[in-house]
């Protein structure tokens, strides 16, 4: 439901594939409304085979006396149903679309065709993945920090935050205003080019 545009691509139901190939016990699905309503206060969901669900039921039964039922009711009253969730997420998209467009504008206008990096152009979600030349992610983030732009730490998308090639930077454009993003992206693309030139010298 975290789509930026109307008529999003429909994702395959991974559980259907697990049923087809007899691997349902290998899959545990998790989700929450945390980025739909408010961070840390959403309702979480768990999907799995009956065997795995029973495993979770046993453990959850002794971990907590029960979920926050008042918060669950607030979520239900606010969102109501799938149509309510989708309507609410369209409002999210209206806020986020210009921010993602600003990121793409700077990446395309300043870095395209220069051989200094590649990047995603997501149709949903909350991040743009930027791959610099190998060995430069930490340096680009350091340079940006010195110029006053705080970026997600290098390796954030990897297990234990260890990017073996030190190249992936996760750009998170959802929080800043479009105006602040404009300034931050001007600095970011300069840092990418500066680090790339220094590496080649």
Protein language model annotation of sequence segments:
Residues 133-137, 176-178:
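Helix N-cap motif at beta-to-alpha junctions
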């Amino acid at each position: 439901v975290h789509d930026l545009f109307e008529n999003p691509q429909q994702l395959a139901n991974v559980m259907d594939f697990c049923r087809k190939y007899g691997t349902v016990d290998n899959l545990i699905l998790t989700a929450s409304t945390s980025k739909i309503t408010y961070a840390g206060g959403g309702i979480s969901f768990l999907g799995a085979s009956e065997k795995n669900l029973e495993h979770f039921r046993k453990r959850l039964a002794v971990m907590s006396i029960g979920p926050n039922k008042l918060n669950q009711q607030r979520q239900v009253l606010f969102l109501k149903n799938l149509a309510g969730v989708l309507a609410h997420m369209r409002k999210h998209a209206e806020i986020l679309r210009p921010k993602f467009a600003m990121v793409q504008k700077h990446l395309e206008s300043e870095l395209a065709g220069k051989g200094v990096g590649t990047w995603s152009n997501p149709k949903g979600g909350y991040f743009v993945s930027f791959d610099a030349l190998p060995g430069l992610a930490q340096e680009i983030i350091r340079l940006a920090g010195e110029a006053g732009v705080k970026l997600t730490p290098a390796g954030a998308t990897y297990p234990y935050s260890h990017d073996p090639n030190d190249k992936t930077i996760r750009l998170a454009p959802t929080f800043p205003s479009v105006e602040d993003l404009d300034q931050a992206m001007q600095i970011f693309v300069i840092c990418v080019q500066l680090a790339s030139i220094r590496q080649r010298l």
